[in-house]
């Protein structure tokens, strides 16, 4: 039986995958302090990830709109997302 309130979590940070809910942000983190973060709502289901390349492109476009310089290319994002999805049972 699954533990109530628990879900499998993987976090990509500093070039590697970490299992669990790794604490990444502190009170002085720019994204928290000044709201400088971007996100997009890509979803994976039934073995597909519709428009993943477009979702990843929007993340980088949103960063540029906020005068942030994306440090990960769309192709790298796409690969990381697929790598992360593979860590979960189908």
Language-model-detected regions and their locations in the chain:
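Conserved alpha/beta cores of soluble small-molecule-handling proteins
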Residues: 1-90
């Amino acid at each position: 039986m699954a533990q109530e309130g628990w879900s499998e979590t993987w976090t990509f940070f500093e070039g590697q995958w970490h299992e669990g809910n790794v604490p990444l942000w502190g009170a002085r983190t720019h994204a928290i302090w000044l709201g400088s973060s971007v996100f997009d709502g890509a979803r994976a289901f039934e073995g597909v990830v519709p428009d993943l390349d477009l979702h990843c492109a929007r993340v980088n476009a949103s960063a540029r709109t906020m005068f942030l310089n994306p440090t990960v290319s769309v192709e790298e994002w796409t690969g990381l997302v697929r790598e992360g999805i593979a860590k979960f049972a189908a």
